[in-house]
């Protein structure tokens, strides 16, 4: 009974969420786009001519936003390269190179390298998150694993001067994640965009300029 009530409350909040309504109005696939938009507007992350990778890109709202930022016009091509990676299937987005699969696997990396053609990435975005169990220690370990995957990807594929933006949760293990970022990046900033729900412990970490590029 409690679970049913919880689901009803979530549905009510979701339907009445101003960011959900705005996403529907502006043609974005998820409200998460406004988290990236706010961070981008304050940090000036996305610029014409960049190569940008969106890790865990499904359903695609972040890639949609990046595409719009690099285009300046609808349907007119883009000034830059966008690559979306995810194990889940995603509906195509114009001008976005989508690669389905686990980016730890060789065949996926080979597809990535074909698109990159020897070039390095300017910006890596990651909205990836684990399925939370409610067990703090286990969830913290899963989150750290995902953060480390994103950092490792950035070290191998990003320009030394590039930036990595990741989602994490401000709870058990968060300080360890921040320390990991400080060890790997010259500048680390914590971001809590307005589009993050008040009840959520979600927070974003932005690392700029790699200390240990590979």
Curated annotation (Swiss-Prot):
It comes from the Bacteria. S-adenosyl-L-methionine binds at residues 60, 62, 86, 102, 127. It is an enzyme of class 2 (transferase). Its EC number is 2.1.1.166. One of its GO terms (cellular component) is cytoplasm. GO terms for molecular function: rRNA (uridine-2'-O-)-methyltransferase activity. InterPro entries: RNA_methyltr_RlmE (IPR050082), RNA_MeTrfase_FtsJ_dom (IPR002877), rRNA-MeTfrase_E (IPR015507), SAM-dependent_MTases_sf (IPR029063). Its main location: cytoplasm. The keyword Cytoplasm applies. It catalyses: uridine(2552) in 23S rRNA + S-adenosyl-L-methionine = 2'-O-methyluridine(2552) in 23S rRNA + S-adenosyl-L-homocysteine + H(+). It is found in: Cytoplasm. Keywords: Cytoplasm, Methyltransferase, rRNA processing, S-adenosyl-L-methionine, Transferase. Belongs to the class I-like SAM-binding methyltransferase superfamily. RNA methyltransferase RlmE family. Specifically methylates the uridine in position 2552 of 23S rRNA at the 2'-O position of the ribose in the fully assembled 50S ribosomal subunit. This is Ribosomal RNA large subunit methyltransferase E.
């Amino acid at each position: 009974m409690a679970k049913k009530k919880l689901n009803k409350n979530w549905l009510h909040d979701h339907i009445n969420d101003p960011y959900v309504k705005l996403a529907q109005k502006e043609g974005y696939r998820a409200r998460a786009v406004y988290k990236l938009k706010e961070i981008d507007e304050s940090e000036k992350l996305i610029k014409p001519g960049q190569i940008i990778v969106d890790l865990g890109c499904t359903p695609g709202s972040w890639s949609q936003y990046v595409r719009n930022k690099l285009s300046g016009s609808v349907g007119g091509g883009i000034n830059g390269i966008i690559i979306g990676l995810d194990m889940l299937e995603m509906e195509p987005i114009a001008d976005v190179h989508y690669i389905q699969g686990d980016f730890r696997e060789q065949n996926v990396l080979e597809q990535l390298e074909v698109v990159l053609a020897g070039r390095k990435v300017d910006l890596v975005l990651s909205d990836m998150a684990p399925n939370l169990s409610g067990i703090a220690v286990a969830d913290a370990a899963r989150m750290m694993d995902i953060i480390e995957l994103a950092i490792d990807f950035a070290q191998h594929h990003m320009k030394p001067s590039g930036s990595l933006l990741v989602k994490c949760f401000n709870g058990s293990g968060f300080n360890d994640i921040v320390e990991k970022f400080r060890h790997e990046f010259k500048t680390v900033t914590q971001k809590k965009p307005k589009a993050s729900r008040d009840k959520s412990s979600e927070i974003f970490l932005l690392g700029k300029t790699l200390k240990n590029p590979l």
